[in-house]
Amino acid sequence: MTCDTVVISDIHLGSPVCNREKVLKVLSLDFKRLIINGDLFDNYSFKRFNKKDWDILSKLRKLSKTHNIIFIHGNHDSNGEFMSAIMGMEFVEYYEFELNNSKFFLEHGDKYDHWIKHKPFITWFFTGIYYWLQRIDKSHRISRLTKKLSKSWIQAKDIVRTKFVEKRGKKYDVLMAGHTHHAEIVDCGACVYVNSGSFCEVKCSYIKIYEHGNFELIFM
């Protein structure tokens, strides 16, 4: 099957837990279009970048000359419009397209997260703790357990999915989000909800969409 589109999200370049090798591996795949569904950057402190981070940006810049690259605004992408212009990518709030009569709608998902809207400081604080645990806990056992026990994280991923489907599900066949770092495919009746996961977890994940409109969630 010919791959039409690859969807990745939540790379968080500059973060100590970004799996850069796997990002580069995905960017080397054969596809026609690349959609970055938010949070390409962790923040814009380039002092935190290492050689692999710059290699990824260089690869994206090179791909933009021959491929259609869509960069969807995520909550970490405060200067995304400026960076997109430099790198030759299209910067948007959301993206929609149709393949073989299937209508796709992509949005990062942070707009449906009540923690981001109403308690941003708490969100940033606990995200920092989680990343710190991933750095010191090389087996990732503590960080995975912390995530599983976090009621706010469990609620956030469910709330994002529910609100996204409520708003867009009647008009589109497939909804795709990122933000929660929880990769999943859920049949919601009127539509299918897919979350591409992230490149900051033990298992990284991304989405392949084929020319006939079928798709798969791939773990690496």
Q: Would you name each region that the model predicts?
A:
Residues 4-5, 33, 102-104, 174, ...:
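Structural motif
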Residues 8, 13-100:
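Core catalytic region of metal-dependent phosphoesterases/phosphodiesterases
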Residues 97-100, 187-220:
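Binuclear metal-dependent phosphoesterase catalytic core
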